[in-house]
Amino acid sequence: MAEAATGFLEQLKSCIVWSWTYLWTVWFFIVLFLVYVLRVPLKINDNLSTVSMFLNTLTPKFYVALTGTSSLISGLILIFEWWYFRKYGTSFIEQVSVSHLRPLLGGVDNNSSNNSNSSNGDSDSNRQSVSECKVWRNPLNLFRGAEYNRYTWVTGREPLTYYDMNLSAQDHQTFFTCDSDHLRPADAIMQKAWRERNPQARISAAHEALEINEIRSRVEVPLIASSTIWEIKLLPKCATAYILLAEEEATTIAEAEKLFKQALKAGDGCYRRSQQLQHHGSQYEAQHRRDTNVLVYIKRRLAMCARRLGRTREAVKMMRDLMKEFPLLSMFNIHENLLEALLELQAYADVQAVLAKYDDISLPKSATICYTAALLKARAVSDKFSPEAASRRGLSTAEMNAVEAIHRAVEFNPHVPKYLLEMKSLILPPEHILKRGDSEAIAYAFFHLAHWKRVEGALNLLHCTWEGTFRMIPYPLEKGHLFYPYPICTETADRELLPSFHEVSVYPKKELPFFILFTAGLCSFTAMLALLTHQFPELMGVFAKAMSDIFCSAEFRDWNCKSIFMRVEDELEIPPAPQSQHFQN
């Protein structure tokens, strides 16, 4: 019974929605017919006469107050709409209308229709759009204590948003903790430390975890099973505590590297022990997975420290060894760190070899991969490229390949060229990025701008060709050329990831919503009426009375514009304009 009643209500609702959607003209004429039939009982003519009499008794001060109040209200609405649009990228009135009024006036539930009628291709595109809107860990993220905090000390600005730091805290809990942490006092403390919001509380917890190893972790083990000779043995120190101190307490890269080397000793020992016990149960397997993540993170950050300190060849060797030792851990995107270090060494053949492995159709793309491939192809022709010569003789095969590579990169992330061409100011990259978004463009340009400048003519070629991409994809939100359509979620996610003092790059450029233009026009129109009424009260009063008579009188069909102005002239006693002698003759 309940299902039948629900089905009947849904069918009734759909019929009403259909009637409002397609038969609104019939409803409109029915309402007009009812008003005409009930004009005598409702005393419509008498009410119109009363309204007309009331309007005729109003003074010009009333119209000044009315138009002034309307202008003020519409101005306030305009200011609020503009602020909301600048902050969230959409109109507040439009959003409320779509969210609350559209379902009542015949909106269709897109989720249900997509779930019931979607094909395999649609589901694939939906999965792709979800993956493109996913927030990723920035493989080139800076050190909080040695770089982000120093920026705050100098400028007084916070380079990281709360949303970004919260995502980092979730990553740390995922990679550096496991279910058996409560069995080890130091790991139990660090499990709470990763959830702390206060940086000083996290640092204090890390120091406490290290002190526990010195005080409470001494165990006695016999040297020989049947012997009375005993040995005092220290349990391994907490590697994750050293990681936290290196990331947040160290004020220089050298201090961070020293702490990461201590973390490497502790983490390597834990990894070797858990590797031997990983097959003894699910608990040991989870602990081994955690120790693997810790070890990979430490080695990667040590390589980044070497890169920051100028030991680029050493950093490249460490990254290569790490990728060989753990080839399946692609979540850290170590190959992007390797590409940047190889570009610094100008080892372009090695860069091409890395791209040949990772620039694959089955792997997720990134701005680093696309723009590095474009840089290598531009390097072959950029030193001799001239727009004038190319327009006369046409593009050669190599130049065409370079231009196509640039178009491919710009289609993937259209925000990067403005930073590479220094048309937009750079800020410190966030700890997380959104692929194809402004955050990824900042992270790429922050580290790779120097590599583009080093290649002679590369930026000139980019400047001459990058805008041609948009002619191939006139509707990027609906259909792409080489990639999926550009996701519409990038602006919202980038506003959460990037600090408030940065102006987020938006693609494609949004036009001003209708309601902002409408309220601006309404505010201007009512302000003009208020000014005219204040300056010419008698003329505007007569004009308002004439208009009210036209719309309220039963004989409004016999009036025209000429009668309005004749009445205005009669009541103001305006003499007729003198006619010229030529006109009289």
Swiss-Prot record:
Its main location: membrane. Signal peptide: none annotated. The modification Phosphoserine is found at residue 386. The chain crosses the membrane at residues 15-35, 62-82, 512-532. Keywords: Glycoprotein, Membrane, Phosphoprotein, Transmembrane, Transmembrane helix. Pfam families: ST7. GO terms for cellular component: membrane. Glycans are attached at residue 47. The keyword Phosphoprotein applies. It is a multi-pass membrane protein. Disulfide bonds: none annotated. It is found in: Membrane. InterPro entries: ST7. The keyword Transmembrane applies. PANTHER family: SUPPRESSION OF TUMORIGENICITY 7 (PTHR12745), SUPPRESSOR OF TUMORIGENICITY 7 PROTEIN (PTHR12745:SF10). This is Suppressor of tumorigenicity 7 protein.
